[in-house]
Amino acid sequence: MSLQIGRTERARSPVFVFAHKRQLLHGRCSTIDNANCSTCSMKINSTCTLTALPIAALPGPRTTSHYSTAAANWCYATVAPRARSSTIAASLGTPAPSSSASFRPKLIRTTPVQAAPVAPALMDAAVERLKTGFEKFKTEVYDKKPDFFEPLKAGQAPKYMVFACADSRVCPSVTLGLEPGEAFTIRNIANMVPAYCKNKYAGVGSAIEYAVCALKVEVIVVIGHSRCGGIKALLSLKDGADDSFHFVEDWVRIGFPAKKKVQTECASMPFDDQCTVLEKEAVNVSLQNLLTYPFVKEGVTNGTLKLVGGHYDFVSGKFETWEQ
């Protein structure tokens, strides 16, 4: 049963929304009751958090009570303190709140919500943020270190090749203090490295080939991290099930050997703990896959190339490494 929501009349008090963010690549929150998710049909158990945000900061028509943005994948429910509201979800049999009643909206969604377009003002602000960020970098870093940046104009000679997750919370140049020119970096979902194949994953293969054969990197580092959504997606995959996210699920299947190992050896552990173990085991699978590339295998055998695994825990602020 899908939800139908009426329009909310303008209230004297500021209107806020409670934004519920889906925490999985797939999985769907079916019920949101004010500030608590009372029922959740996600494939793993996780706490649903709600954040109060000014409605003026959100895209889309202000009279629409339920919509989502494609980029953030949030569901929004408008809430006006003591709102004078029209009926909500007649299909649920929920009476309209009186003007003196506390308004507690309930959203029940069983089908994905169509994304609303982002307001032009928000898009302009996002682009401006990039421009101001560069200006700060140029005045505070680039212009003050000409001796550092001048050699980079002639070419690059990085010591490291780094595989890291595309997760926005994970930035190896920041967490490891890497300067421009130090690391040839590849980022993707769950920091995966596929096995050698001439007909598939050429994007990753070409990067490895160039880093090892042309740039002559000395160390290849594969870095996993805490609370990785790609790893959760991998552990949640059911054999034979249809893909909800075709590209993502096809990609994370690279880590299937690690998943099977964790499910066999850690079956009694809670899901979140299994994910933590899998974050590291998936790194080991990627390190093993690196050895299937002839030029990588040759470098390791000759002692000119080293393979290193790493794990960044941004919850506890820890970083660990191990060698293949």
Curated annotation (Swiss-Prot):
Designated name of the protein: Carbonic anhydrase, chloroplastic
Source organism (scientific name): Hordeum vulgare
Keyword line: Chloroplast, Lyase, Plastid, Transit peptide, Zinc
PANTHER family, alphabetized: BETA CARBONIC ANHYDRASE 2, CHLOROPLASTIC, CARBONIC ANHYDRASE
Subunit structure: Homohexamer.
Protein family according to the UniProt entry: Belongs to the beta-class carbonic anhydrase family.
Gene Ontology molecular function terms on file: carbonate dehydratase activity; zinc ion binding
Superkingdom of origin: Eukaryota
PROSITE patterns, per the entry: PROK_CO2_ANHYDRASE_1, PROK_CO2_ANHYDRASE_2
Gene Ontology annotations for the cellular component aspect, listed alphabetically: chloroplast stroma
Pfam families reported for this sequence: Pro_CA
Compartment(s) of residence: Plastid, Chloroplast stroma
Catalytic activity: hydrogencarbonate + H(+) = CO2 + H2O
Claim: Zinc is one of the keywords in the record: yes
Function comment: Reversible hydration of carbon dioxide.
Example GO biological process: carbon utilization
